[in-house]
Structure formats: C-alpha cells, structure tokens
Amino acid sequence: MVCPSPLRECHPFLQRSFFPSFALSHRDIISTRACLNDNSPAFDRRYHWVWEEDRRCLNLGKTLASTIHHKGGNLSLQWQRGNTTTHIATRWDANKLLLARAILKEKRNILQDKTSVNVNVNKLIPIPKKKVLKNRAKSLLSIKSHVHFHLIPFINFFLLYHQIILSHSLFHISHLISFHFLFFSFLSFPLLSFILFPCFSLFLSSNSFSLASPFSS
C-alpha cells in the first residue's frame, strides 16, 4: 500500500502496530466503520487525533481494539486531510486478535514513554514533569545529607579549637583529652555535635575547671 505524499511522516504508534504506510498529524481526521458478517453496521464513529502540548488522543487504538471481537467482520478506515481522502478496507480474522494485544501494549508503552510529550489520557499516569521535580528533590536531599555528615564535623573542629585558644587552656591535659574524644566522636556521629559542643564550651569557660592563663602576669 503506497503512502500518499501528504502522509509521509509516520507516528511510532502506527508505524510499529498497524499501518506503517500512514501517518497522522493535527490536521488528520479518522473515520472508522465496522460491520458484522451480515453487513449490519456495528458502529460508525468519527475520531480526531488531537495533538496538544500536554496530551495525545489515542482513540484510534481504542477503536481498533474494540472491533477485534468481530473476528469475521469488516473494518474500514478512512484518513481525511483537507480534500485528500484515503480509504483502507481490511477483513478481520483470528490472527487479528494478536494485533489487538499489540495495540493495547503499544498504547501502554506510549503512556509510559518519559521522553515523549506529556501524556494525559484519563489521568492514567502522572505528568512526567512531576517525576523530574521529585528526582531533583531527592538529589538535593542527598547533597544536604552529604554536607551534614562530612562538613559539620570539621566546622566543629575549628570551633572547638578556637574555644580552647580563647580559654587559654591549650596545654591543659584534661582539655586535650576531652577535645580529641569529642573530635573523633563528631567524625563518627555528626549529630552529637549539636549536643556535646555547647556542653564542652561550658566546660571550657567554667571557672572551676579553667587554669590561670599562662600569658597573664
């Protein structure tokens, strides 16, 4: 079947599933008509393949799948673009049941395609932009935890060192022991810094535990 010149670009849904020779755009109108074996019309409906920024209308696959149970019936499809009309007639048989499964599977694949335009058909899946924002939030949380567990211990190290200098007790053996104990504790358990650092500051500034400054007269 030769593809008319206005219908050269093929949509992946049609290319992999049904008619690889035809394509659709926002200007295409799809007409379907299915008849039973006795030629009584099962339905005669007209569908528009709608292209918008955030949704795709997949009524074509839905229509084709709904006609599969008429295994012996006839299905006619009609593409209409302006004054150009293309008719397709086919006869369903038992093998077309496999085609129905392929259509439904392809429809799910399109809905789950993260690289395609945002799809919103009956709100079956969330908009992919929300997933991107969620992943960005997770990355920010991981950066925050990384900074917390690796940067805070060293900040506390310099704060404690500065506090020892100010208290003029750098050479006091008890302060050195406490200082090293707290420092290595902070490296292993950063959350302890918020509890032990104020206590250690009070310990250094206490008059009962501080010695006279070696620099005082």
Curated annotation (Swiss-Prot):
Lineage: superkingdom: Eukaryota
Subcellular localization, as worded in the UniProt entry: Mitochondrion membrane
Keyword Manganese: no
GO cellular component: mitochondrial membrane; mitochondrion
The keyword ATP-binding belongs to this UniProt entry's keyword annotation: no
Keywords assigned: Membrane, Mitochondrion, Transit peptide, Transmembrane, Transmembrane helix
Lipid bilayer topology: Multi-pass membrane protein
Transmembrane regions listed in the UniProt entry: 151-171, 177-197
Chief location of this protein within or outside the cell: mitochondrion
Designated name of the protein: Uncharacterized protein C17A2.11, mitochondrial
Organism field: Schizosaccharomyces pombe (strain 972 / ATCC 24843) (Fission yeast)
